[in-house]
């Protein structure tokens, strides 16, 4: 209770706790779109999941407890960024955009997988292994969608 006296509100306390982690997550997500830092998706996911593991408690409250703070749209903003990346990939690989609802659903599925890993109580090794397998599933799904789009052209 005494900690609240140093902050004007619960939201201000929350923001102080999550700010550094949130900014680091934004930077990591931004690195994925930076052409000069372009990584293979599996390597990107490994870096992201390592960071999340190292900051698990703060990442949990950022994803599930940000309502009423300036971070309440953090999850939606991250998903929007992922949707943009996926749309750009389809444009590059297939020369066309994919249905926006489909892209939205694919991103939500992947993000939900991250959140389930975050909420779970698994070891670092298991978290990284499941994340790696989820990335393989995601990549294979995208390849199948790209093949279908190219077949229809």
Which residues does each PLM region occupy?
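Helix-turn-helix
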Residues: 1-12
